């Protein structure tokens, strides 16, 4: 596992999916399913936008962190890895 915090968090999410650790928020999300997690991504996106417009920079950072976490859970449910996203971003940078 790399030192990248995104990769570390994704690995933890995969572990939670595998072990279904009781009391884990990640497990709660997984049990509720992809549609629920997708809805949470939308909610967190809206909260990040609002924070960027009318709240502090720290609050914006917190909301972006929530958004990234929920995106990673959705990615795990879709079997998409951070490396898949890194590869696509690198491809786009070459254009």
From Swiss-Prot:
Top EC class, one word: hydrolase
Gene3D superfamilies per UniProt: MazG-like
Reactions that this protein is recorded to catalyse: 1-(5-phospho-beta-D-ribosyl)-ATP + H2O = 1-(5-phospho-beta-D-ribosyl)-5'-AMP + diphosphate + H(+)
EC number assigned by the record: 3.6.1.31
Gene Ontology CC terms: cytoplasm
Subcellular location: Cytoplasm
CDD domains: NTP-PPase_HisIE_like
Gene Ontology biological process terms in this record: L-histidine biosynthetic process
UniProt pathway: Amino-acid biosynthesis; L-histidine biosynthesis; L-histidine from 5-phospho-alpha-D-ribose 1-diphosphate: step 2/9
Alphabetized UniProt keyword annotations: Amino-acid biosynthesis, ATP-binding, Cytoplasm, Histidine biosynthesis, Hydrolase, Nucleotide-binding
Gene Ontology molecular function: ATP binding; phosphoribosyl-ATP diphosphatase activity
A Pfam family that the UniProt record links to this protein: PRA-PH
Taxonomy, superkingdom: Archaea
Claim: Transmembrane is one of the keywords in the record: no
Family that this chain belongs to: Belongs to the PRA-PH family.
Record-given protein name: Phosphoribosyl-ATP pyrophosphatase
Organism: Sulfolobus acidocaldarius (strain ATCC 33909 / DSM 639 / JCM 8929 / NBRC 15157 / NCIMB 11770)
């Amino acid at each position: 596992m790399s030192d990248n915090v995104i990769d570390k968090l994704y690995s933890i999410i995969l572990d939670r999916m595998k072990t279904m650790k009781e009391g884990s928020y990640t497990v709660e999300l997984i049990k509720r399913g992809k549609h629920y997690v997708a809805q949470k991504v939308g909610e967190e996106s809206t909260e990040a936008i609002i924070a960027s417009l009318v709240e502090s920079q720290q609050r914006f950072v917190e909301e972006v962190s929530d958004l990234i976490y929920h995106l990673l859970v959705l990615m795990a449910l879709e079997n998409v890895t951070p490396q898949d996203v890194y590869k696509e971003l690198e491809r786009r940078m070459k254009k």
